[in-house]
A protein has these predicted regions:
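Active-site metal-coordination/substrate-binding segment of hydrolases
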Residues: 59-124
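Generic recognition of short, well-ordered alpha-helical segments
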Residues: 25, 104, 137-138, 186, ...
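N-terminal helical capping/dimerization or prosegment-like subdomains
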Residues: 1-73, 236-240, 254-257, 331-342
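Hydrophobic/aromatic beta-strand patches that form the interior of the parallel beta-sheet core
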Residues: 62-64, 126, 151-153, 312-314
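Acidic/histidine-rich catalytic neighborhood of metal-dependent amide-processing enzymes
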Residues: 99, 103-171, 175, 211, ...
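Predominant activation on well-ordered alpha-helical scaffold segments within soluble catalytic domains
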Residues: 11, 31, 104-107, 111, ...
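Metal-dependent amide/peptide-bond hydrolase catalytic core
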Residues: 164, 173-355
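Short glycine/proline-enriched coil/turn segments at helix->beta-strand junctions
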Residues: 5, 35-39, 44-46, 58-59, ...
């Protein structure tokens, strides 16, 4: 069997347009690789997944997951986003860093373990859709169709460090209500002033529960809209708040605290993108310590938020490069990733056997 080449696989992936909801051609590439290695797989919409050959339902099952979709290229690109171009140790192309590098190296890791007998765990590899838009037909659709998952490694660019916690997200649509009047008459109730009081609360309130990994809950007002003309006191003021929730709160808990402290109407677009974290005694913490891998809390969102199991985030590449013009990943990052994943899973297997 031809050895798996992650650089070649990623180059092929880059050359395929795979925007959210348009992942089928990229999914077909993963299908062709699994077919080459004679591995059975299941297709669910634009998602594809496979189990290790000697799957045993009595064992713990670990999910290896990353996403097929990319954002659309921005106007700052100077290179063809769909042409995999190597230069000075870098592989350029849309999705190379977020998260094609993680996807192909997790696939390579799965191929390494697939045929092994007597693994101390099961492995499921899943290439999922719609991560970039937190869509309904990606991991949210797929997870219930997988075997029971005990733990997940989600492939995202982390410099191959391990993110042991991740902030959740809520977007709030807020509306302050006033009473319109002629601006010259010093009458009415100015909805903008009403909104300012609540906006000041959003900017200054500190949630009491702090996290060692993800810090505090952050609330940022990102949009404000009010008024129709210069001489009318506005009766409504709409504003949007971006809320990043640490792993000490659920989204609903934070939403209830907000509603009890502000006067404006508050509506959450969604409460499903919760924070994630692992228990203080989880074996992956011991693995990271033994392998001298840095751990941290991530402020950015991934499909972890849609997984009702403990999970970490780990992968080649740098989150700072995600969604940037002329996106790239270092080739040596790809070369280091599979051995690092293998070491983590091997050590994790030893810890599971001890526990």
């Amino acid at each position: 069997m031809i050895p798996f080449n992650p650089v070649e696989a990623l180059s092929n992936l880059i050359s395929i347009r795979s925007f959210s909801k348009e992942e089928e051609p990229a999914r077909n590439l993963i299908e062709s690789i699994l077919t080459t290695y004679e591995i059975s797989f299941t297709i669910d919409l634009n998602n594809i997944w496979a189990k290790n050959k000697h799957f045993d339902s009595s064992k713990h099952t670990i999910l290896l997951n990353s996403h097929l979709d990319t954002v659309k290229p921005n106007k700052g690109y100077t290179k063809d986003p769909f042409y995999p171009h190597s230069e000075n140790g870098k592989l350029y192309g849309l999705g190379s860093n977020d998260a094609g590098g993680a996807l192909v190296t997790l696939l390579g890791t799965f191929l390494h373990f697939h045929n092994e007998k007597d693994l101390p765990f099961n492995l499921v590899f899943a290439a999922s859709a719609e991560e970039e838009i937190s869509g309904k037909n990606g991991m949210e659709f797929l997870f219930s169709r997988l075997p029971k998952i005990d733990f997940a490694i989600v492939g995202e660019p982390t410099l191959l460090d391990i993110a042991i916690a991740e902030k959740g997200l809520m977007v709030l649509d807020c509306k302050s209500i006033g009473k319109s009047a002629h601006a010259a008459r010093n009458e009415g109730v100015n909805a903008i002033y009403e909104a300012i009081n609540d906006i000041n609360w959003f900017s200054s309130y500190v949630f009491p529960k702090q996290s060692d990994e993800t810090g505090t809950v952050n609330m940022t007002v990102t949009q404000v809209k009010s008024g129709s003309q210069h001489n009318v006191v506005p009766s409504e003021c709409d504003f949007v708040v971006d809320v990043r929730i640490n792993d000490k709160y659920s989204n609903n808990e934070v939403l209830n605290i907000i509603k009890s402290n502000v006067k404006c109407e508050v509506s959450a677009r969604s409460t499903r993108l919760n924070s994630s974290g692992i228990s203080s005694n989880h074996p992956i913490r011991i693995v990271a310590e033994k392998l001298n891998i840095n751990t941290y809390g991530s402020p950015t969102l991934s499909d972890q938020s849609l997984m009702p199991c403990e999970s970490v985030k780990m992968g080649p590449g740098d989150s700072a490069r995600s969604h940037t013009a002329d996106e790239f990943i270092y080739i040596d990052e790809l070369e280091q990733a599979i051995p690092k994943y293998i070491a983590v899973l091997t050590q994790l297997g030893e810890e599971l056997m001890v526990s």
